[in-house]
């Protein structure tokens, strides 16, 4: 009995709060305010910065996978780094379940010790 009473009182209170001075109930809809904001309108801070960069075709925080090249000596896979060396993992074959890790140093392109794919270290500046 008490739960029915409280539920009814809550509904009446909600209706009273929605009424304006003229007595008409105020309704709020997504269409009246312009609809649901898009991701671009709602994003702030770092998320907004990343979205703007993505629209320009940039990847300031290296979130996307690197673009694979042919891996030959003339066209090596470019590996961005802020230092003079970086550790690189090569899967070698598409269905391989192990990763071959090796150090890549600044300068000439270097080969994966297992499959022979070439990688080259390129300087990268941080976005800050």
Swiss-Prot record:
<dbReference type="GO" id="GO:0046872">
    <property type="term" value="F:metal ion binding"/>
</dbReference>
<dbReference type="InterPro" id="IPR002124">
    <property type="entry name" value="Cyt_c_oxidase_su5b"/>
</dbReference>
<keyword id="KW-0479">Metal-binding</keyword>
<feature type="binding site">
    <location>
        <position position="90"/>
    </location>
    <ligand>
        <name>Zn(2+)</name>
    </ligand>
</feature>
<protein>
    <recommendedName>
        <fullName>Cytochrome c oxidase subunit 5B, mitochondrial</fullName>
    </recommendedName>
</protein>
<keyword id="KW-0007">Acetylation</keyword>
<dbReference type="GO" id="GO:0006123">
    <property type="term" value="P:mitochondrial electron transport, cytochrome c to oxygen"/>
</dbReference>
<feature type="modified residue" description="N6-acetyllysine">
    <location>
        <position position="120"/>
    </location>
</feature>
<feature type="modified residue" description="N6-acetyllysine">
    <location>
        <position position="67"/>
    </location>
</feature>
<dbReference type="InterPro" id="IPR036972">
    <property type="entry name" value="Cyt_c_oxidase_su5b_sf"/>
</dbReference>
<comment type="pathway">
    <text>Energy metabolism; oxidative phosphorylation.</text>
</comment>
<dbReference type="Pfam" id="PF01215">
    <property type="entry name" value="COX5B"/>
</dbReference>
<dbReference type="GO" id="GO:0005739">
    <property type="term" value="C:mitochondrion"/>
</dbReference>
<dbReference type="GO" id="GO:0005743">
    <property type="term" value="C:mitochondrial inner membrane"/>
</dbReference>
<keyword id="KW-0472">Membrane</keyword>
<keyword id="KW-0862">Zinc</keyword>
<dbReference type="GO" id="GO:0043209">
    <property type="term" value="C:myelin sheath"/>
</dbReference>
<keyword id="KW-0999">Mitochondrion inner membrane</keyword>
<feature type="transit peptide" description="Mitochondrion">
    <location>
        <begin position="1"/>
        <end position="30"/>
    </location>
</feature>
<keyword id="KW-0496">Mitochondrion</keyword>
<feature type="binding site">
    <location>
        <position position="115"/>
    </location>
    <ligand>
        <name>Zn(2+)</name>
    </ligand>
</feature>
<comment type="subunit">
    <text>Component of the cytochrome c oxidase (complex IV, CIV), a multisubunit enzyme composed of 14 subunits. The complex is composed of a catalytic core of 3 subunits MT-CO1, MT-CO2 and MT-CO3, encoded in the mitochondrial DNA, and 11 supernumerary subunits COX4I, COX5A, COX5B, COX6A, COX6B, COX6C, COX7A, COX7B, COX7C, COX8 and NDUFA4, which are encoded in the nuclear genome.</text>
</comment>
<dbReference type="GO" id="GO:0045277">
    <property type="term" value="C:respiratory chain complex IV"/>
</dbReference>
<comment type="function">
    <text>Component of the cytochrome c oxidase, the last enzyme in the mitochondrial electron transport chain which drives oxidative phosphorylation. The respiratory chain contains 3 multisubunit complexes succinate dehydrogenase (complex II, CII), ubiquinol-cytochrome c oxidoreductase (cytochrome b-c1 complex, complex III, CIII) and cytochrome c oxidase (complex IV, CIV), that cooperate to transfer electrons derived from NADH and succinate to molecular oxygen, creating an electrochemical gradient over the inner membrane that drives transmembrane transport and the ATP synthase.</text>
</comment>
<feature type="modified residue" description="N6-acetyllysine">
    <location>
        <position position="85"/>
    </location>
</feature>
<feature type="binding site">
    <location>
        <position position="92"/>
    </location>
    <ligand>
        <name>Zn(2+)</name>
    </ligand>
</feature>
<comment type="similarity">
    <text>Belongs to the cytochrome c oxidase subunit 5B family.</text>
</comment>
<keyword id="KW-0809">Transit peptide</keyword>
<feature type="binding site">
    <location>
        <position position="112"/>
    </location>
    <ligand>
        <name>Zn(2+)</name>
    </ligand>
</feature>
């Amino acid at each position: 009995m008490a739960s029915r009473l409280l539920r009814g009182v809550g509904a009446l209170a909600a209706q009273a709060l929605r009424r304006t001075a003229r007595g008409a109930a105020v309704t709020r809809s997504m269409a009246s305010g312009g609809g649901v904001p898009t991701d671009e309108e709602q994003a702030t801070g770092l998320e907004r910065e990343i979205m703007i960069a993505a629209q320009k075709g940039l990847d300031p925080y290296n979130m996307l996978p690197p673009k694979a090249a042919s891996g030959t000596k003339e066209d090596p896979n470019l590996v961005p780094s802020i230092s003079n060396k970086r550790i690189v993992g090569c899967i070698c074959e598409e269905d391989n379940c192990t990763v071959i890790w090796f150090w890549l140093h600044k300068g000439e392109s270097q080969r994966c010790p297992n499959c022979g794919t070439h990688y080259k270290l390129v300087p990268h500046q941080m976005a800050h």
